[in-house]
């Protein structure tokens, strides 16, 4: 992504992909937001065994009711551009807290995360799209020192490993009853 402080030029990524492919038996890919695959990453695609995209509707100011449709557009846009390559979603998720930095605080909570998770997994299973949900656990060390920094709150579990609303039905034995 363009905002990173350690951006690697595409021609250098191509060199790395070629180097890895010489020594690996596994398929090789490169994980990135969906947008660069429409432009600057086009030369890289020929070197990849499959394409890996990230999609975060909430970072792009999408309401939960538009989120899955937006995710589909991101996926289909890349898949249609490169019909010869399999495409998977290697990061997709919904934050549960925000201080307003990049994400409207009214557009994040555990209920909305649960809706997006179920919509996303239902669609990807129906379509046979390999999808990885970002992320397993909140990472309280990420982002700024502000406790509500959205980078800290993408997990399906809190940083203390207790399940958020979306995971509670699957991990009831981890949730203490409120007295």
Where are these regions (language model features)?
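Substrate-binding cleft/loops of secretory-pathway carbohydrate-active enzymes
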Residues: 35-54, 99-101, 139-151, 155
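Alpha-helix N-cap and loop-to-helix initiation/capping positions
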Residues: 7-15, 65-70, 104-115
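Aromatic-rich peripheral "rim/lid" segments of glycoside hydrolase catalytic domains that contact
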Residues: 104-112, 123-179
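A short, acidic, amphipathic alpha-helical segment used as a generic capping/interface helix at domain edges
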Residues: 72, 76, 114-119
């Amino acid at each position: 992504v363009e905002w990173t402080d350690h951006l690697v030029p595409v021609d250098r990524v191509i060199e790395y992909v070629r180097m890895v492919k010489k020594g690996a038996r596994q398929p090789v890919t490169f994980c990135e937001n969906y947008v660069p695959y429409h432009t600057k990453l086009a030369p890289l695609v020929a070197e990849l065994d499959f394409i890996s995209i990230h999609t975060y509707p909430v970072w792009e100011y999408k309401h939960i009711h538009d989120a899955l449709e937006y995710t589909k557009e991101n996926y289909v846009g890349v898949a249609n551009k490169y019909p010869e390559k399999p495409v998977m979603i290697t990061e997709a998720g919904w934050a549960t807290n925000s201080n307003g930095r990049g994400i409207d605080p009214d557009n994040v909570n555990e209920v909305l995360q649960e809706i997006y998770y179920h919509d996303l997994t239902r669609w990807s299973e129906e379509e046979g799209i390999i999808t990885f949900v970002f992320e397993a656990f909140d990472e309280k060390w990420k982002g700024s020192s502000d406790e509500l920094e959205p980078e800290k709150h993408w997990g399906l579990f809190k940083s203390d490993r207790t399940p958020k609303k979306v995971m509670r039905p699957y991990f009831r034995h981890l949730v203490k009853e409120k007295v």
